[in-house]
Amino acid sequence: MAVHVTRNQTQRGVLCRPADPRLDFLLDVDVSALKAAPKIGELLLVTPEEKVEDGLWRGTARVSLGLEEDAMVQERLTQLNHEIPLDFPPNVLAEAAELEKRAAEGAADLGGLKPLGSVEDALPIDRVSKASTSKRQDLRGVPFVTIDGEDARDFDDAVYVRRLPGAPDGAVWELWVAIADVSHFVLPGSRLDREARDRGNSYYFPTSVEPMLPEVLSNGLCSLRPDEDRLVMAARVGFDDRGIPRTSAFFPGVIRSRGRLTYEGVQEALDHGGELAGRHPYLKDAEALAHLLLERRQARGSLDFDLPEAQFIVNRSTGEVEGIKRRVRLFAHRLIEEFMLAANEAVARFLTAKGTPFPYRIHPAPDPDRLSTLFRTLASTDLAQSDLLTLKRGETPSPSRLRDILVQANGTPQEYLVGRLVLRSMMQARYSPEAGEHFGLASPCYCHFTSPIRRYADLLVHRALSFTLGATPGPILAGHKLLMAADQCNARERAATEAEREIARRLGCLLLRERTGETFTGVVSGVTEFGFFVEFDEMPVEGMVRLTTFRDDWFEYDPDRQELIGVGTGRRFRLGQAVTVRLTDVHIGRLEVNLELEGTTDTAKRSSSRRSAGGREAPGRSSGRKRNGFVPRHKRR
């Protein structure tokens, strides 16, 4: 157990409080095994031994983690709180090293390639799908590129788009998506496989990554690095001029990426041309197809939530949190998102049609009680007269209905309120061996295929696809075993999500602890019976104004309206309202940022200036990132 030292010089050593804010008791800790006496604010690993009385335990310190003001120490603490594995066992590393050795000696299976000199020489989709796929297609003539963040190290997807002359099947666009063939290296039942299953996914923090696979694989053999031959599982999907998929084919292959592009570089090329656009002229075709796919997805009702995404700036030498900013979402991000969504859907449709067991990614329709609360709350806003709010008894609104509500609120004072309420009505997306819709994407059939380096569910989908194509003999998981694997993936995804939220709160506390007494503007981001949360305009960090700080009034809580109403003064606080607050104190051990109200405005604050340029999985490239920082939401579908 990790604890904070809150007082030294007790009878046994020091008095501590658990660093996990869910635990509420004190420990009298023996620190005789430590090399030096711990300081107040230091974090220790402690073994609890016996309960002395209510709220007090005895324990013995095993090791000091460091001072709480160090961001890296806070990351380590968060990892402990959520049982996130760190170092790989020696036998797993040995197995990975053997794969690297075999690849270096040329033992990796790159033989028997079917020739494909250039993309123009590619077989028509219908012929590829009927051809034998037990051997790899040579796709090194296709000008694939990877597009990722500037600090990405593992590249698991590469793309290429081209326009087609009028094809008899109606396809006028051709999307190629090549995904690292992790299943070639990580075999079922191997030590690497068991370790990857236990981890479930990679875990990303502002200054570190705990990968699902050893770096020999994640950043080496499997990573689609430029100018190196890499094994892939490829998808080729043809679309008509409305963005409707008409054809698809899947096959194992080998590619040679033509470039390691960044989102920022691609956006510059799309906006202004230049040298990169000259080297990769098909980027404009990719942009056009992405717009087409986005428009079609929105037309069917897919939900997008434009929420702020934090990027912490940490000095890795000192551990100091130097700042925080909202990530800017570019169309280049959305371009990759649309292509990954299209590939995921195409694979899910194919495997479903073939009757192959695999883990679906499902997102159930919203809970009826949550929807009822949502519609009652919206009925108290300026949207009250909208026909969209007419809901028959027992009716579940379609994704397109909820999307229309979001669109109608765009640019109004209710935009923030409506966006938050719709998001809170959503269920949790999860993996399941049983087919089901993805409500947030308005997709009847969906899976995760595009990130097998960092999500175990994707690796299972790759094995199912390879088996169905006859490229591998199996076995693949089915029945109860597939259910157990899906449940494990769900559990580890939840751990990753909770850890992400916790480290954001911890680093937010570190950033604010030296700014007590300062005044901030913000917006009410949550309302409870004991106070309301405020998200700062300056940074995506929340604090709380407790009702106990008001000495001149008594407040009643209206859950339907998400509102607090002053009994004596009539003063109101509701979701989305603009306020000015003063930071009174910060308790990092309890993850508390305490505020007092300074002033309000009468209307809800518009959120368009507070948010990133796009949205994502209330739906989600789910859980997993490709860089040392927060995973972009477009990676989470």
Regions found by a protein language model. Name each.
Residues Y203-A299:
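Conserved catalytic alpha/beta cores of large enzymes that bind or transform nucleotide phosphates
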Residues G166, F239-I244, V314-T318:
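Short acidic-glycine loop/turn motifs at beta-strand connectors
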Residues Y263, E268-D537, M544-R546, R551, ...:
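Append "with occasional cross-activation on large, charged helical scaffolds in nucleic-acid assemblies
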Residues L23-V29, E68-T78, H82, V172, ...:
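Single-stranded RNA-binding regions, centering on S1/OB-family and related RNA-binding modules
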Residues L139-T146, E150-P168, A286-R300, E502-T521, ...:
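Phosphate-interacting basic helix/loop segments used at nucleotide- and nucleic-acid interfaces
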